[in-house]
From Swiss-Prot:
PROSITE patterns: RECF_1 (PS00617), RECF_2 (PS00618). This is DNA replication and repair protein RecF. GO terms for biological process: DNA replication; DNA synthesis involved in DNA repair; double-strand break repair; SOS response. It holds the Pfam family SMC_N. It is found in: Cytoplasm. The lineage of its organism: Bacteria, Bacillati, Bacillota, Bacilli, Lactobacillales. InterPro entries: DNA-binding_RecF, DNA-binding_RecF_CS, P-loop_NTPase, RecF/RecN/SMC_N, RecF_2. Gene3D superfamilies: P-loop containing nucleotide triphosphate hydrolases, RecF/RecN/SMC, N-terminal domain. Its main location: cytoplasm.
Length: 374
C-alpha cells in the first residue's frame, strides 16, 4: 500500500500542511526539533489511531489550538481510500471513505505501518513488556480478531486484578464472581496465546532467512514463544482455554494472596536464539542488533503474507544507529518493495548511494521544502 497524500491541521508543530509522497523512499531531513518525528508520528497515528510516543492524545494537538486533524489517501490493490482522524477534547473520530466509524477497531487495518526507531534495537535486550507490546502492536494490525481479543483480555485483566485486591483486603468475599472473571479471562487469553504462537511461527520463518543473510551465513536465528501453557503449533484454542482456566482454579488462593493475576498472556515473552544460544543473555551487542533488524524486516513480509499488502515502513533516525553492513541490508531489503519514510539529520554517503530516486523533504519549523535530488 502507498500513502499518496497527507494533510495535517494543527497537529503538533504543523499548522496546515498538505504533502504528496513518493511511492518509493521519502527522506525527511532537518535539524533537531523541527518536526521530522512529528511527521512520522502523524503517519503512524493515521495507521493505528494512537501515537507510539504518548498515550495522551491531547499532546498531539498544537499547543495554541483545541483540535487537530490528520487525513490522507491510501492506495491499495482495491483502490484509493481516504482516511481521516480528528482529535479534540471530546475524544477522537475516525473516518474511512468519509464515513465515521462507530469503533476505532473498525478503522485499524486500513493503513498498515511498521515503525522502526532506535529503541526497537533494544527489542532483544529490553524488558519482556517491550516484546509483549511489540506482539500486540504488530499482530493487531494484521488481524482485527487479535486486536479485539487482546483488548478484551486487557479490560478483563484490570477487572479481575481489582477484584483480587478487594478479596485480598476483604472488601469482598464472594468467590463466584472471581470464577466468572477467570473463565472469561481464560477464553480471551487462549485466543491471544494461540494467535501469538501462529504469528511468531510465521515471523520466525522470514526472520531466520534475513538473519542468515545479514550475518553472511554465519548465524541461524530461532524465535521461541515463552508462555506458561507451553503451547505447540497443534494446540487448539479450546485446549489452551481449558489449561489456562485450570491454572486459575488451581491457583485461586495464591492469586488472592498476591492480589494479582499470575497466569496468562500478560506474562509471556519471546526468546531469540542465535546458533541455539539465547542472544539476550549471551549475544554480543552486534548480534542483538542484527536480530532486532531481522525481526523488524521480517514483519514487512509477514504483514504482506497476512494482509495481502505491504505496509509502509517508518524509519525514525535508525540509519545513524546502524553500521554500514546493516544500513546496506536495510536499504536493499526495502528498495522497490515498501514505501519508506525515513528521518535523519544528515544522510550518509552510503545511504545516498543506496537509495533509489528518493524524494527529499527538508523540514524546518513545521514546514516542508522539497529538495531537488542531484
Ligand atoms: N503539541 C505541540 N504543539 C506545538 N509544537 C509541538 C507540540 N508537540 C511538540 N512540538 C514541537 O515539535 C518539535 C519537535 O519535533 P520532532 O520531535 O518532530 O523533532 P525532530 O525534527 O524529529 O528532531 P530530532 O532530530 O531532535 O528528533 C519541538 O520543537 C516541539 O516543541
Amino acid at each position: 500500500m502507498i500513502l499518496t497524500e497527507l494533510h495535517l491541521h494543527h497537529f503538533r508543530n504543523y499548522q496546515d500542511l498538505t504533502v504528496h509522497f513518493n511511492p518509493g523512499v521519502n527522506v525527511l531531513i532537518g535539524h533537531n526539533a523541527q518536526g521530522k518525528t512529528n511527521m512520522l508520528e502523524a503517519i503512524y497515528v493515521l495507521s493505528l489511531t494512537k501515537s507510539h510516543r504518548t498515550s495522551n492524545d491531547h499532546e498531539l494537538i498544537n499547543w495554541q489550538e483545541k483540535s487537530a486533524l490528520i487525513s490522507g489517501t491510501v492506495e491499495k490493490s482495491i483502490g484509493k481510500i481516504p482516511l481521516e482522524l480528528q482529535f479534540s477534547s471530546k475524544g477522537k473520530k475516525a473516518k474511512v471513505n468519509h464515513l465515521e466509524q462507530a469503533r476505532l477497531s473498525q478503522y485499524v487495518g486500513q493503513l498498515n505501518a511498521i515503525l522502526f526507531a532506535p529503541e526497537d534495537l533494544s527489542l532483544v535486550k529490553g524488558s519482556p513488556a517491550l516484546r509483549r507490546h511489540f506482539m500486540d502492536r504488530e499482530f493487531s494490525q494484521m488481524s482485527s480478531k487479535y486486536l479485539y481479543n487482546a483488548g478484551q483480555y486487557r479490560t478483563l485483566l484490570r477487572q479481575k486484578n481489582k477484584y483480587l485486591k478487594q478479596l485480598k483486603y476483604r472488601q469482598q468475599t464472594d468467590r463466584v464472581l472471581l470464577g466468572v472473571l477467570s473463565d472469561q479471562l481464560a477464553a480471551f487469553g487462549a485466543e491471544v496465546i494461540i494467535a501469538r504462537q501462529h504469528f511468531l511461527k510465521h515471523l520466525e520463518g522470514w526472520a531466520a532467512d534475513l538473519h542468515q543473510e545479514i550475518s553472511l551465513n554465519k548465524e541461524s536465528l530461532r524465535l521461541e514463544y515463552v508462555n506458561q501453557l507451553k503451547v505447540s503449533d497443534d494446540t487448539t484454542v479450546e485446549e489452551a482455554y481449558q489449561a489456562l482456566f485450570k491454572l486459575y482454579q488451581d491457583n485461586e488462593q495464591r492469586e488472592i494472596e498476591q492480589g494479582t493475576t499470575i497466569y496468562g498472556p500478560h506474562r509471556d515473552d519471546i526468546r531469540f536464539l542465535v546458533n541455539d544460544k539465547n542472544v539476550q543473555a549471551f549475544g554480543s551487542q552486534g548480534q542483538q542488533r542484527t536480530t532486532a533488524l531481522s525481526v523488524k524486516l521480517a514483519e514487512i513480509d509477514l504483514m504482506k503474507e497476512q494482509t495481502g499488502e505491504y505496509p509502509l515502513l517508518l524509519l525514525d533516525d535508525v540509519l545513524s544507529e546502524l553500521d554500514t553492513i546493516r544500513q546496506t541490508h536495510l536499504l536493499t531489503a526495502i528498495q522497490n518493495k515498501v514505501q519508506t519514510f525515513l528521518t535523519t539529520t544528515s544522510l550518509s554517503d552510503v545511504a545516498r548511494q543506496l537509495i533509489n530516486e528518493p524524494t527529499i523533504f527538508e523540514i524546518e519549523h513545521g514546514t516542508l521544502n522539497k529538495e531537488e535530488v542531484k
